[in-house]
């Protein structure tokens, strides 16, 4: 017989029926972590007052049996039936208190990992390896050290007034440097998440990432349908050949070589042993079409729907090609230019289209949840209501509204973690700034330590012949956002959302009726008839599409997105762990596949 969970009986059977959290050790009043010894009486009284207030509110608002008599509130009265005992308000509130203490204890017990950098900030006194956009620069584009020091002073003292004294070079403000210092009440702390150090300025790996970015700029108006092994596109073939000559290119390969099918596909970077990096390709990312199905399907939203057709930038919308325009952006100014758009919406069908989608964004992950909820995708088998004979979930727990609330929460919390790496650890320069170093080394003979593989590449030669510049062409007139490059915030957001969606839904479900944009008319789609596409694989592809899409715009290195995907995954897992502590349902955890192919149960 199932024991009433609200029973006050002290039987052994009733004790066993209590949830795991109910068994947690009661916190000691003398605990130094949560209560100071001199404030214990005040803390106790305050907590008692909270319990009393909660009881009154619950009694008045939570039950139709509440009544008012002689000006005094009377708690809810229950019919005298066998299993209808009065709800224990204090026990419920105390359980919430103990769950929160346990969540804090668990998170506090996670060790703080090392946070190695690439050493560029210390290596170069003129800060050419560090992000300084938005601050004033000299005529070469080197930051004025007084301004850079005003930034690092604020980041060191963390005094809100010091942030207001950062010396800016123009009207453009820095993006949320204090945001990462906010303390999240759920999930892991930013300092407890490790990412590999980014490639150093002078390294062959950084050179390889730069060459890839120059090719992404050159191929912006190439259809994504040409990124397959039977391609006849000469630019695609030239890019593949050039990338295969690089000594340290870490993007996806087949049989040890870059192919048209692997070109510009995504990857994930985890912390390896020591300060090394472990490079992986998530399951499904190399399967089928380049673009995830979640970017091609109509989003059903109640009685409405959201079309997957997007506003696209016209070919030739490339910016920061002129050094003075580039310098104005570095100084926090404006290019004075804007994107010219195609008046007719269409499906994402070119490299530029995906870059523009990643520039502006849309209801990407909310949309994916709505698609999954409507196309027959089963819930994750670990969902306790999958096998319930009498109940279903709701917005409270284990149904779409609950999942969507966690998606929104995850998006905020992961940005705190990503921006902490940006501002308080790495301060890595953006690709557009690297392009300025390349330009100045060639045009002004500046002695910058750029690896020779950049200058020997066909990517740089073709950039000059196409755009008449050695700067990295940008797809956005403002260039990159005014915070540093590593790790990528948009990619981290993609990862936390995709990981949560894999926890909520059955990732092994095969997506029905997949489509691809019609290469002859990208305002339409046609059926895809290749190998099966699973929910998990297409969610992984969605995350990597978004991460690489930022590179299509010219604003992020591959490693920015690849490291951020691992970071976002870890934030999602920590949120699920905290959330689990509060459930009343019998729940054995969500099992899903991480980006590195390992199975986890949370």
Go through the PLM ranges and name each one.
Residues 1-40:
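N-terminal secretory signal peptides
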Residues 4, 30, 57-61, 582:
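N-terminal non-cleavable signal-anchor helices
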Residues 36, 41, 59, 65-558, ...:
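Hydrophobic alpha-helical bundle signature of multipass membrane enzymes
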């Amino acid at each position: 017989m199932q024991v009433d969970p609200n029973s006050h009986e002290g039987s052994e059977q009733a004790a066993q029926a209590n949830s795991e959290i109910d068994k947690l050790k009661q916190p000691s009043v003398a605990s130094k972590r949560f209560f100071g010894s001199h404030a214990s009486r005040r803390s106790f009284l305050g907590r008692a007052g909270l319990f009393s207030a909660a009881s009154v509110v619950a009694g008045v608002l939570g039950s139709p049996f509440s009544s008012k008599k002689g000006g005094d509130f009377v708690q809810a009265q229950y019919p005298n039936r066998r299993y209808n005992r009065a709800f224990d308000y204090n026990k419920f509130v105390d359980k919430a208190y103990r769950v929160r203490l346990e969540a804090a204890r668990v998170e506090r017990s996670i060790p703080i990992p090392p946070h190695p950098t690439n050493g560029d900030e210390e290596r170069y006194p003129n800060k050419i390896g560090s992000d300084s956009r938005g601050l004033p620069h000299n005529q070469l584009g080197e930051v004025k050290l007084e301004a850079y020091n005003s930034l690092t002073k604020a980041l060191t003292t963390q005094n809100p007034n010091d942030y207001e004294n950062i010396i800016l070079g123009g009207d453009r403000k820095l993006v949320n440097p204090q945001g990462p210092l906010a303390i999240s009440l759920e999930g892991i702390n930013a300092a407890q998440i490790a990412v590999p150090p980014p490639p150093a300025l002078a390294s062959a790996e950084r050179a390889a990432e730069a060459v890839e970015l120059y090719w992404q700029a050159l191929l912006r108006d190439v259809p994504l349908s040409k990124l397959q092994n039977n391609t006849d596109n000469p630019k695609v073939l030239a890019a593949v050949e050039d990338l295969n000559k690089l000594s340290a290119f870490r993007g996806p390969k087949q049989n040890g070589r870059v192919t048209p099918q692997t070109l510009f596909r995504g990857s994930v970077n985890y912390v390896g042993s020591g300060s090394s990096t472990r490079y992986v390709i998530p399951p499904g990312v190399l399967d089928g079409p380049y673009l995830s199905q979640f970017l091609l399907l109509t989003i059903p939203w109640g009685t409405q729907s959201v079309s997957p057709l997007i506003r696209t930038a016209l070919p030739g919308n490339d910016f920061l090609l002129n050094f003075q325009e580039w310098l104005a952006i570095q100084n926090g100014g404006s290019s004075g230019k804007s994107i010219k758009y195609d008046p007719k919406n269409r499906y994402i069908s070119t490299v530029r289209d995906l870059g523009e989608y990643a520039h502006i964004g849309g209801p990407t992950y909310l949309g994916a949840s709505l698609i999954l909820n409507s196309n027959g995708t089963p819930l994750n088998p670990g969902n306790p209501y999958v096998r319930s004979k009498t109940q279903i979930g709701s917005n409270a727990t284990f149904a779409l509204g609950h999942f969507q609330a966690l998606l929104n929460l995850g998006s905020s919390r992961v940005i705190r973690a990503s921006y902490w790496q940006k501002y308080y650890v790495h301060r890595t320069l953006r690709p557009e700034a690297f392009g300025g170093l390349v330009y100045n080394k060639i045009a002004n003979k500046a002695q910058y330590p750029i690896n020779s593989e950049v200058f020997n590449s066909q990517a740089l030669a073709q950039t000059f012949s196409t755009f008449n510049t050695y700067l990295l062409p940008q797809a956005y007139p403002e260039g990159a956002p005014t915070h540093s490059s590593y790790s990528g915030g948009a990619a981290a957001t993609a990862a936390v959302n995709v990981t949560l969606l894999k926890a909520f839904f059955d990732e092994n479900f095969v997506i029905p009726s997949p489509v691809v944009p019609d290469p002859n008319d990208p305002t339409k789609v046609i059926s895809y008839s290749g190998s099966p596409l699973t929910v998990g694989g297409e969610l992984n592809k969605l995350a990597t599409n978004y991460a690489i899409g930022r590179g299509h715009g010219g604003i992020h290195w591959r490693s920015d997105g690849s490291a951020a995907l691992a970071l976002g995954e870890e934030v999602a897992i920590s949120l699920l762990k905290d959330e689990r502590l509060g459930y009343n349902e019998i729940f054995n955890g969500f099992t899903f596949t991480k980006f590195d192919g390992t199975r986890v149960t949370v």
